[in-house]
């Protein structure tokens, strides 16, 4: 297996998604907060989007089954939540750090993986977005909340913007790791601005 820059960035994305899911479980008032349920929420948040992407692409076995390092990244993320719950919860609430970094990383990597499987650009952008958001959809559903992508804040749209930028820079033969960083950074910046300024897409009206 090639342990490239993007590979380690992907593991970092897995870890921050685990932290996002586990801290969401800890913060939820109606959640039981036992060790297994907190771990499972973090686990399903981390692997949900990538699993759906791999199934769609026919990439079997799915990534977390064939690469044990993904499971280790999940374990490390869960361990951080258990050992430093107040610290990671503060970061998550004040900086939107883990969700924001997670979707930035996973959108771009999902887009790249789809392209590597010979998928057209439009489908690659959608699969990149799905890679980033589907774990969060499952997390919010488990928490009995409206999934984040259906709320006012700009979320999935930021992922699509990052995917499109990645595709454009890839077409211009931008260096792969630089493309990853720039495209993921665009997603992070859009999310932070949207949250800071309370921006959202306009509602559709039914006449």
Regions found by a protein language model. Give the residues of each.
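Cytoplasmic-side transmembrane-helix entry/capping segments in multi-pass membrane proteins
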Residues: 35-41, 67-71, 92-103, 127, ...
């Amino acid at each position: 297996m090639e342990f490239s820059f993007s590979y380690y960035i992907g593991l970092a994305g897995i870890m921050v998604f685990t932290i996002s899911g586990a801290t969401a479980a800890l913060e939820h008032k109606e959640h039981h907060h036992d060790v297994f349920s907190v771990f499972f929420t973090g686990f399903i948040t981390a692997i949900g989007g990538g699993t759906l992407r791999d199934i769609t692409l026919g990439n079997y076995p799915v990534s977390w089954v064939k690469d044990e390092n993904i499971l280790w990244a999940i374990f490390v993320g869960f361990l951080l939540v258990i050992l430093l719950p107040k610290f990671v919860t503060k970061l998550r609430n004040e900086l939107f750090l883990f969700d924001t970094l997670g979707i930035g990383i996973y959108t771009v990597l999902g887009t790249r993986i789809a392209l590597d499987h010979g998928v057209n650009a439009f489908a690659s952008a959608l699969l990149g977005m799905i890679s980033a958001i589907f774990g969060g959809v499952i997390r919010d559903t488990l928490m009995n909340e409206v999934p984040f992508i259906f709320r006012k804040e700009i979320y999935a749209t930021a992922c699509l913007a990052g995917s499109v930028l990645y595709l454009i820079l890839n077409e211009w033969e931008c260096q792969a790791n630089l493309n990853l960083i720039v495209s993921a950074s665009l997603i992070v910046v859009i999310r932070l601005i949207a949250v800071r300024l309370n921006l959202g897409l306009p509602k559709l009206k039914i006449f």
